[in-house]
């Protein structure tokens, strides 16, 4: 697997794109971290308990200790996404071109539903609308075989059952300005759902852009938003819309920066500008950004830098959406090698602090950080050994 295809394309986003899975301010005593791993065939997704008072994961002599049994996925599970109420979950299985569905057992572990749902070629990212009516799946395709990527849309039924909507998968339609007359074969990498309105945004690594679509709330059908194609930096690899603001951020792995946008009421994007100028705001970030996530209130944004082996933190201006990097000595922290995904979980107390987790694909470890909410300070806890080649990660 290439470095690019080895990076998580979601986040889950989210309901999101690098996928935001937090229980907000819940004081529940039961909390879990879920980790999808690619080191076996088929892959697995495993639950681990979180001690919310300490941020520690269930472990023994530095090795994660699972809750219950690991559930099997398809081959090479990448994105891992829960529904908003955390009653079922999905993995995008890049190697077997399908989606696995899971329900949650009483002990917090996952149980795989019978059968899998066929996706397009090489599904790499997942996102869901806030009402959990639709699952959006980015299929990478294979440009080397002249097979461009696209987006599959599934309606979500009882127990998380999936049914593909009419006319799915939907093409990216990259034949209009501002791209060249003959653009490169699209290579979509990530997807995010807007916090307001029925819009999704898909990054295209090959053409250096993000594409906007509206989705029909009844049928799930996709249509281009006005303008549709918005140029960003080199090799966009992650896209994220915070859960408490109508902003969009695109992290570019080739130029190591973040493009910042306001989502308009029609789904089109307007570049956020630096203070007192008309210059589009572009935030510098770590080497090879692969995933993004924020807290529930969208006070902070965190970026996993895959090649820089670190997490980089930013404050989000609640009015303008402008990102400001937190001081390096408190807001940037080292991870294990090759972080590909992020998860965040409230510590359940009244102080509002959080625990932040990274899935480190290169090191086969999980990193944990305490997030001091008043300052954005990240304090590392000991890394723990994980199953081989961990990928998607989520917390509940």
Locations of regions flagged by a protein language model:
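Bacterial N-terminal signal peptides that target proteins for export
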Residues: 1-11
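Bacterial N-terminal signal peptides
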Residues: 10-22
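Predominantly soluble domains enriched in secretory-pathway, periplasmic, or organellar proteins
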Residues: 23-396
């Amino acid at each position: 697997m290439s470095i690019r295809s080895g990076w998580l394309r979601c986040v889950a986003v989210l309901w999101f794109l690098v996928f935001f899975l937090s229980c907000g301010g819940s004081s529940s005593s039961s909390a879990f971290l879920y980790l999808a791993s690619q080191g076996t065939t088929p892959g697995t997704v495993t639950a681990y308990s979180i001690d919310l008072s300490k941020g520690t994961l269930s472990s023994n002599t530095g090795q994660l200790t699972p809750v219950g049994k690991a559930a099997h996925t398809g081959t090479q599970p990448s994105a891992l996404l829960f529904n908003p109420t955390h009653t079922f979950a999905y993995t995008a299985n890049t190697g077997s071109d399908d989606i696995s569905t899971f329900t949650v057992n009483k002990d917090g572990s996952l149980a795989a539903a019978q059968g899998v749902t066929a996706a397009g070629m090489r599904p790499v990212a997942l996102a869901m609308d806030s009402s959990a009516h639709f699952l959006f799946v980015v299929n990478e395709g294979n440009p080397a075989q002249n097979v461009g990527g696209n987006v599959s849309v599934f309606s979500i039924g009882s127990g998380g059952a999936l049914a593909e909507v009419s006319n799915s998968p939907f093409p990216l339609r990259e034949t209009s300005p501002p791209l060249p007359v003959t653009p490169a074969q699209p290579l979509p990498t990530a997807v995010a759902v807007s916090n307001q309105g029925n819009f999704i945004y898909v990054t295209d690594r090959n053409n250096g852009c993000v594409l906007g679509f509206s989705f029909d709330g009844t049928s799930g059908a996709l249509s281009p938003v006005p303008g549709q194609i918005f140029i960003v930096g080199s090799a966009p690899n992650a896209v994220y819309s915070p859960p408490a603001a109508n902003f969009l951020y695109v992290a570019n792995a080739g130029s190591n920066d973040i493009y910042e946008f306001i989502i308009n009421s029609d789904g089109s994007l307007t570049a956020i500008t630096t203070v007192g100028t008309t210059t589009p705001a572009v935030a510098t970030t770590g080497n090879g950004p692969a995933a993004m996530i924020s807290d529930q209130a969208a006070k902070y944004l965190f970026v996993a830098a895959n090649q820089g082996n670190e997490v980089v933190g930013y404050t989000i201006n609640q009015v303008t959406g402008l990102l400001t990097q937190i001081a390096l000595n408190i807001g940037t922290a080292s991870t294990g090698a090759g972080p590909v995904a992020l998860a965040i979980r409230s510590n359940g107390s009244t102080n509002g602090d959080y625990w932040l987790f990274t899935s480190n694909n290169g090191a086969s470890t999980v990193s944990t950080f305490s997030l001091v909410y008043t300052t954005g300070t990240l304090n590392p806890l000991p890394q723990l050994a994980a199953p081989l080649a961990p990928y998607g990660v989520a917390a509940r």
